[in-house]
Amino acid sequence: MTTFNEYPFLAELGIKAENNDGVFNGKWGGAGEIIKCLNPTNNKVIATVRGAAPEEYETCIQAMLAAKVKWALTPAPRRGEIVRLIGQAMREKIEPLSKLISLEMGKIYIEAKGEVQEFIDVCDYATGLSRSINGQVMPSERPNHILMETWNPLGLVGIITAFNFPCAVLGWNAAISMICGNVQLWKGASTTSLITLAVSKIIEKVLVENDVDPAVCCVLIGPGRTVGEQMIQDKRFGLISFTGSTEVGRRISSTVHGYFGKTILELGGNNAIVVAEDADIELVLRAVLFASVGTTGQRCTTCRRLFVHESLYDTILERLTKAYKTIKIGNPLEEGVLVGPLHTQSAVKEFTEGLEEIKKQGGKVVIGGNKLDISGGNFVEPTVVAIEHDAPIVKTELFVPILYIMKFKNLDDAFAWNNEVPQGLSSSLFTNNQKNIFKWLGPTGSDCGIVNVNVATNGAEIGGAFGGEKETGGGRESGSDSWKQYCRRSTNTINYGNTMPLSQGINFN
């Protein structure tokens, strides 16, 4: 039994109840296995998609190769205008698209709407960037010479995105990659196939209406073991951008770097908030609540570790427990709900098995810890656990709403505990002490790619570069100078004189 007819907004997005095409190479098709798209609120089928057959991969590549040169030669401001129009088209569909994200992914509606807005914001940012991407011009030591650099497209870019941000992460990558002059192949998570379809149809319409080869943005829906494997093995890609687990990212890294290809890897996070003794408790509580339970603990930047100074520990724990008791759990499309379901039943298993291991390692559940029986969906209670900082499980990432709380005496210890895990994505310090702030931001502070003060670990703005260090992968997406990763840099020396002087004063006469 399907739930398709309960959601009229699906038709607004061009989605059918059965056999939606899952391959786009300028034209829609799909000859592979049928994918059942589930609603995590009740685990009923929403609709079905026919995924890609292995042989359809090459049709996408050939279509991209055919579109590559013309798109690369299109002036960057014109490419930026196309991206602006994509953002505008997304803006016009923000309501039904946000509802679809809530329905298929499981995050609450207001967060889903924020995700679509993030895609729109990146398009706006990329549009402006299309008129300002540039290389440096540097003084030459030789007379009548110019030393400069140019940035050219990589050609083919592969974008593999995860279930938790099935719309925004495409925007981070595709909007920037497009203004840089690349053509892209997108493989979204199989469990969010309808979102992949809806976004792709919006992009396709803009490209066609503006006489751009729609193969500039191709799509393959299918499992990673087939579609993803074909992509990472293909040396024709100038870049593979992957968002997902550290385990899969490690394999992608070894494969792509094995043939000296380029990657952007956004992998696991094990993010911490450090609460100093002078912290503003009200700020702490608001930040921790959103950071730990937002998106049901399924953000890369979710706060998983909370280090609290001993003088504030009891107060923070008591008030945080009270706040957790007020959280409304349920259908993410219902107003007032703060926590929706986990995305899959396997995530529920990760939650229950993770708690068993936590207890074996001395952890004590302060609040939560239960699987919930709500409408047959993947619901669990957001959970707070008291545990030692060096318990082995604390160094792994459980992608569920479990928050570890730990007490410290010395701020230097808390800084060290923040850094002792293999991951290095996001971190935040709550303090009003200027010395501690700049120590936290400096070489002996946090070793993460995102280092905040008095804000949550999650909810990053698009203007900054997003990414982390260590086993988080080292890649950067979205803002700042992340655009450089989607380009090929060349250093140029131009002689406009009549002599041939050599650098470093060499005389080779």
Curated annotation (Swiss-Prot):
Active site as annotated: 266, 300
Residues noted as binding NAD(+) in the record, renumbered to the chain: 244-249
Matching InterPro entries: Ald_DH/histidinol_DH, Ald_DH_C, Ald_DH_CS_GLU, Ald_DH_N, Aldehyde_DH_dom, ALDH7A1-like
A GO CC annotation given for this chain: phagocytic vesicle
Bridged cysteine pairs (disulfide): none
Record keywords, A-Z: NAD, Oxidoreductase
GO MF: aldehyde dehydrogenase (NAD+) activity
Enzyme class: oxidoreductase
BP-aspect Gene Ontology terms: aldehyde metabolic process
Pfam families cross-referenced by the UniProt entry: Aldedh
Catalysed reactions listed for this entry: an aldehyde + NAD(+) + H2O = a carboxylate + NADH + 2 H(+)
EC number: 1.2.1.3
Site feature: Transition state stabilizer: 164
Subunit structure: Homotetramer.
Family of this protein: Belongs to the aldehyde dehydrogenase family.
Protein name per Swiss-Prot or TrEMBL: Putative aldehyde dehydrogenase family 7 member A1 homolog
